[in-house]
């Protein structure tokens, strides 16, 4: 049993139109690419889709719920059917759950946040990685401008485009921290998966000064 396919999507809540409101059109291209990637992922025939994000290590079962209320939007999401569980999903997993709902995926779903290595369950898994690159691409970026950010994001994009797990594992953690790469643990967890992979980079963007990627990995 193994990870049979993976997709990477942005972790920005601005991907969700209800959150972005008047700025929703600014991420329209990323949103379309993310929908495409998730549709491919859910068609991979895995027994379970696992949504993976960065954060303190935790696991979330099918039916776990979350909300965007912390961003002023009373939008509730869940991993699979909403069975009324308390809203405990962290933001990256809320975004993953929202994207899965848009595809009308009705299969088994779970979630996990990682701060290091991740071991896949003993079933065939499709992995939805919710992660951004740097937050320093422009002066108005969340982390302000840093001239090193574009090159760092370029390394991420190249690794995603070529299914290069070693390149993801080798990303400089110290520099990533300086460039506010909150998605590094999730990207490294993806990189730790045994290949080879047939990969495609669907989007590479820096709207709002944040490195954002959409990619699909399938077993070669």
Question: Predicted regions span which residues?
Answer:
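Conserved beta strand-loop-helix elements of the APE1-like EEP
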Residues: 100-104, 184-195, 215-218
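A short aromatic-anchored loop/beta-hairpin motif
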Residues: 1-88
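Active-site beta-strand/loop microenvironment that shapes enzyme catalytic pockets
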Residues: 113-155
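Cap/lid and interdomain-hinge subdomains that line or gate substrate/regulatory clefts
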Residues: 79-119
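Short Gly/Thr/Asp-enriched flexible loops that form oxyanion-binding sites at enzyme active sites
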Residues: 62-65, 96, 138-145
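Short, basic/aromatic-enriched C-terminal tail that caps enzymatic domains
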Residues: 208-220
